């Protein structure tokens, strides 16, 4: 097994966060009274609205800024944001769907081997930091992609990046580094 061989790694996207604007003022009290699946947080000045399909949660401010979380793809996030804008239009607001942007993607990837974290950190010191007393994972930052990876000794990697493409590229870039710090599999023969 070498680092150059093509290994199919499954990258599971667990959360996509997007933001958009409505270009109109939103009456939070009206949304709370007439909307479905809403929680009015008056002390904070926002409304939480949940959609069932796609399964997303939106944080709505009176300024018209809306943050949607919980989608599992960029397409699903946009579809959910549009459904949310449509439901606000049905409540009587003059909503115009603008400034849609995916701001964060969280994904999980499992390597087919375990990783020696102290060795990995020593080999990649400027980008990697490992504090086993504080957190069981190595924090590895790729500034060019604006991605952060949490690398666990079990081979599980949690990736946070600005979009799905950056997350996939980050996993491709990290694979050779974690491969050289992999744990050897011991085989017992009798």
UniProtKB/Swiss-Prot annotation:
SUPFAM superfamilies: TATA-box binding protein-like. Belongs to the TBP family. One of its GO terms (biological process) is DNA-templated transcription initiation. This is TATA box-binding protein-like 1. The gene is TBPL1. Signal peptide: none annotated. Keywords: Cytoplasm, DNA-binding, Nucleus, Transcription, Transcription regulation. Pfam families: TBP.
